[in-house]
Amino acid sequence: MTQYVSNTRSGEQEAFEPDDPENVLVYTCGLTVSDDAHLGHARLWVQSDVMTRWLSHAGYGVRHVQNVTDVNEKIVARVGADGLGDTEAAVAAHYTQSVIDDMRALNLARADVYPRVSEHVPEIIDLIGDLVDAGYAYEAGGSVYFDVRRFEEYGALSGQQVDELDPQGPDAEQAEKRHPADFALWKAGGVSPDDANTHRDDELPPLDGERGQTWASPWGEGRPGWHIECSAMAMTHLDDHIDIHVGGQDLVFPHHENEIAQSEAASGERFADHWLHVRLLETDGEKMSSSLGNFFTVSNAVAERGPNVVRMLLVSTSYTQRQTYSEATVSEATQRWERLQRAHERAADAIDSVAAHAKPADDALRTAVADARGEFAAAMRADFNTRAAVSALLELASAVNRHVDGTDTYDYQGLHDAVDAFETLGGDVLGLQFDDGAGEDAVSLADDVIDLVLDVREQERTAGNYERADDLRDRLEALGVSVEDTDDGATVRR
């Protein structure tokens, strides 16, 4: 069956026909690590995650790259805030770890590579040099700008004309540029106080003097521009031509428009066959964003609602559709997740019962499983329609409940197939994490055993049997339990 995807560049839904189905190249624009991630960021992550999970499930070989922008004036603006450190690198390191923690909490499948801008400056400089040599870019005052009028298709992605575009970049750049819409590939020097303080919190003292990391280049000491970074990293870790480029709707212009221009000017090839843009998450009628202050961090949402409810919320609406965060939508997501989890648990419990083997096939249940699989696949092939995919699983949950409620004996194979559908479609594709009811008991038992071993170890230490105590500590650490002895006793991290 054919996979269909939307394409912002063509404005149409198209058949997905990769050059090599065993090596589908996907690039997702990641996060500028200047603050804790919020649910608006998570919507992009989760939708991109589900896309690549589905393609893998459907038999494609997928190579997925998601960048980390760790060089940016917004990061510099956070220097000295809340003990984050006094350098751009220190702030970026802090928030990069925060993003990693959030991704793990949301059960995102690992991308193949998470390239960081700071580790790809040589590749960025080489790409800029190619554009200068080809006549698509020019140096001015130690900076390098892309000449948008040299690229005939500029504006095609966003549907704009070059001469109607607003100026790109701060006022200080305008005098150096040949056209107001030209954009910076390389910026001379560090981040100016004006640029940094534009993004700095009002309660923080303003920065003075240039800040941020700089690198030597053929045009002098400076920093890469924002747009060139993604082109260089995509070309380095994927190819000059990729199959799918995913990003937030707010990146269509100027970021992705500029990516296309600089990438295709440098390589002479079509940069990406399909541009998929995830609609922004809204709250109270406005997009959720750090600048508006109307956001909910991923960590807080997961702590309050649980990772499965958050994921269910973010997949309950297709990526091309408007999505709202509110108490009502969170409540709906909670109910959907609980329905799926309860049906999965009831099916698993019924399978374990003696009566599971006593009843012949239940045609209604087995038909419901087959229908759910077919409807789920059809939904995902129709431009990753996660809303319809979730609905297919909810219909299966209803069928499972009808079967379990309607008899004292159960169709073992039918229930087994239902559990498998929940776990492969809801789990492997949508990223939900099902628990058959034994999980909490198993965790509790493991904690009790660990506590017992810690008690024995403390007794060995008290008795002076330090080698035995150290051996127990090492064996615990091999199981992921860190033990550190202090004057106040042992500190344990699990």
UniProtKB/Swiss-Prot annotation:
Biased composition (Basic and acidic residues): 196-211
Keywords on record: Aminoacyl-tRNA synthetase, ATP-binding, Cytoplasm, Ligase, Metal-binding, Nucleotide-binding, Protein biosynthesis, Zinc
One GO MF term: cysteine-tRNA ligase activity
Residue numbers covered by motif 'HIGH' region: 31-41
EC identifiers of the protein: 6.1.1.16
Record-linked Gene3D superfamilies: Cysteine-tRNA ligase, C-terminal anti-codon recognition domain, HUPs
Pfam families, A to Z: CysS_C (PF23493), DALR_2 (PF09190), tRNA-synt_1e (PF01406)
InterPro entries in the record: Cys-tRNA-ligase (IPR015803), Cys-tRNA-synt_Ia_DALR (IPR015273), Cys-tRNA/MSH_ligase (IPR024909), CysS_C (IPR056411), Rossmann-like_a/b/a_fold (IPR014729), tRNA-synt_1_cat_dom (IPR032678), tRNAsynth_Ia_anticodon-bd (IPR009080)
Binding site for Zn(2+): C29, C230, H255, E259
Note on how the cofactor is bound: Binds 1 zinc ion per subunit.
Localization: Cytoplasm
Motif ('KMSKS' region): 287-291
Cofactor(s), by name: Zn(2+)
Catalytic activity as recorded in UniProt: tRNA(Cys) + L-cysteine + ATP = L-cysteinyl-tRNA(Cys) + AMP + diphosphate
GO-annotated cellular components: cytoplasm
Top EC category: ligase
Protein family according to the UniProt entry: Belongs to the class-I aminoacyl-tRNA synthetase family.
Protein name: Cysteine--tRNA ligase
Gene name linked to the record: cysS
